[in-house]
């Protein structure tokens, strides 16, 4: 409660201080009963289905269709699709809880299940009712895949460097170009595609690109070989080439020329989910490390009794809990329709770094066994690295964070956003 002096100095009435006190009592970090049930159901599926199958799919690299179908039947796939389009209609926070739980079992299998999320976001942001009913409705009805096609061989972090172009002819657009590292590309029923619609290289990004929904069976689309990646190996990643691909004008997402804003806006919705994936991996690292430390003996006692190991476990726990807080906050920002670029970037950046440090510590705690594929932490370390790369590298997140805080400080005299 504010003191009488503080109340007077700030110009707050007694009624206002009462409201402030009431609001402070309403702040809670507890999940609702429904959210706890969602989390428990996802974690049960993760431990019973994903954990036992993780190593097999990591070795084979096969896409986990049967597991994807099971997840869809349980409502764990694309849970953020609104009920009006046939989906579960879960919040961004509830979706993050599912991603975290599934990633505890295997981030590669999780990506197979939740990979369409990034393609869903721009449709949700900029799609008209007909587009949402058709494309979101299809994802809700069946366990199918959709892909986000923006990255190119020469345009990763620099989205303004996209070379894929589109040309309007009558009631159609003709798309030509090549996209790289497309998650789910080998199985996608439709693609979100960003193409340059203004041939002037000096045109501002906000007016130079147009976004499309492109059906996967459109003539002129070719799918490259499945990439052999360091981690998350069952995730299907490919190059997608568009050669004179004709797309009806009705498949433009948002206004012509406004594609860059649509593509970037999707990240505010999806980065909390990516952060949640990193959380799940870090959580698994901590559990595996604690279990091993209580069993493995060295110098006549369990290694958990050695301070060097205790400190690594403590560091993992500290960062995991902090990453979880900012991830949940960034997800809640989306649900509350608060502009979330700042917190979403912090969550994605910190959770990604947390996952990588947790994996490094886990391997260290396991010692020589941690370097061997017979133990789970070797795979966790390989899977962790991509979180510092995809959906915006950790360096790009830091650029976003610094620009926003400096701009806010210049305008408001404080870095607190």
Curated annotation (Swiss-Prot):
FAD binds at residues 148-157, 181-183, 296-298, 306-307, 364-368, 393-395. It catalyses: a medium-chain 2,3-saturated fatty acyl-CoA + oxidized [electron-transfer flavoprotein] + H(+) = a medium-chain (2E)-enoyl-CoA + reduced [electron-transfer flavoprotein]. Coiled coil: none annotated. Pfam families: Acyl-CoA_dh_1, Acyl-CoA_dh_M, Acyl-CoA_dh_N. Substrate binds at residues 157, 268-271, 392, 403. GO terms for molecular function: flavin adenine dinucleotide binding; medium-chain fatty acyl-CoA dehydrogenase activity. It is found in: Mitochondrion matrix. It is an enzyme of class 1 (oxidoreductase). Pathway: Lipid metabolism; mitochondrial fatty acid beta-oxidation. Its EC number is 1.3.8.7. Keywords: FAD, Fatty acid metabolism, Flavoprotein, Lipid metabolism, Mitochondrion, Oxidoreductase, Transit peptide. One of its GO terms (biological process) is medium-chain fatty acid catabolic process. The active site is at 391 (proton acceptor). Residues 1-13 form a transit peptide. The keyword Oxidoreductase applies. GO terms for cellular component: cytoplasm; mitochondrial matrix; mitochondrion. Its cofactor is FAD. PANTHER family: ACYL-COA DEHYDROGENASE, ISOVALERYL-COA DEHYDROGENASE, MITOCHONDRIAL-RELATED. This is Probable medium-chain specific acyl-CoA dehydrogenase 1, mitochondrial. It comes from Caenorhabditis briggsae. The gene is acdh-10.
